Amino acid sequence: HHSSDSRMTAEPGIPVVGATGALDLELHADALPPAIAARFRHVTAGVTLRAPVAADTLRELHRQQLLLVQEDADGRVLRAARLQSPGALDELYAMAADTGLGVTVAPDRTRFALWAPTARNVALCLHRDGTGPAQSLEPLRQDSRTGVWSTVIDRDLSGQYYTYLVDVHVDGAGLVRNRVSDPYAISLT
């Protein structure tokens, strides 16, 4: 089940509440490829499931609240679990490995790029100094193939202070807006 507004709950004995959609998963009976089995050797043996959808659909789903739910014949929850998606994100956004991240300053422009594949929205906050409020807010656009959010400002912003606002689903809290520093920064205030 998935929820685009992060308000889904799954309690045993009743149907899932607040889902905006569901996806039937397929049992994957084949052995995992050796490279994947080695990478996740710390995960105990269990059922392997497959989502029979295109990569673009999976990318969009990972930006939402996701629950793996086992239901009875009447649609009542038997068991539910949150998904652990780091391995899936690495596979879905492998192209990001070749993308420049952080800030790149040139005489006539400054590019900002942040890898945040599960974010629902990202904005750049430009600050006058390291402690004051944002003076301007610039929306970033996501490249759905890489999960990188970016924008270009048509001027040299050398020495400018900035942070990001990142809207993301957080298990147990819903949709949360975080003000974060640039993880690729070479200096922080």
List PLM regions with ranges.
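Short edge beta-strand/loop segments characteristic of extracellular beta-sandwich folds
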Residues: 1, 110-117
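The feature marks proteins involved in alpha-glucan
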Residues: 5-111, 132-135, 143-189
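Short proline/glycine-enriched turn/loop motifs at strand-loop junctions of beta-rich domains
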Residues: 115-122, 157
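N-terminal cofactor/phosphate-binding cores enriched in small/glycine residues
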Residues: 139
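Predominantly extracellular/luminal cell-surface or secreted proteins
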Residues: 1-3, 125-129, 167
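Short beta-strand elements bearing conserved aromatic residues within extracellular beta-rich modules
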Residues: 122-124, 162
